[in-house]
Amino acid sequence: MNSKAFRPAIKVITVILVSHWAWKIVSGIPVCPEVYLKWQQITYFLCVILSQWTDIVLRAFTGVQFLQIENCFYFPGGYSVHISPGCIALKPIYHFVVLMIFGRKAIPGLRLIFLLIGVAVLVNFNILRISFLCIIMAVNPSLWFFFHTYFFRFAFYVIILLLWILWEES
């Protein structure tokens, strides 16, 4: 068996694992209150923007009844979906950016263009993810936990892997 065939896969796994642990370490480092509060403002703003785009998708493509107030969606039956800073896809985007940095050599401008396209794909997927989770909450809340915790987390990394393959093979 040729070990060179496995090098790209080993590289992806290594980069994802190392960047995952780097994320965990850096996110656990205490920062000064001013930086923390500014970060809270930024992430809250991103949550509200994500909620607004989700609202547009839900109103345009579904018949789901809901009330949206800032970053919360309320559904009949007393169910709700709250868009928190963990929902804005920063970690998957971070993993994608790290993979691009450690990916194949390329013209910097080309890498930047693909990086921007990849981030746009991930952001749009996240809008669809939140929209789908809202539909699930409105239709069958018992499935929400599975899709939120397992399915979409896996789906994000499948998309990152597909983007990386597209980059490496282009």
How would you name each of these model-derived features?
Residues 1-170:
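Hydrophobic N-terminal alpha-helices or hydrophobic patches in metabolic proteins across all domains
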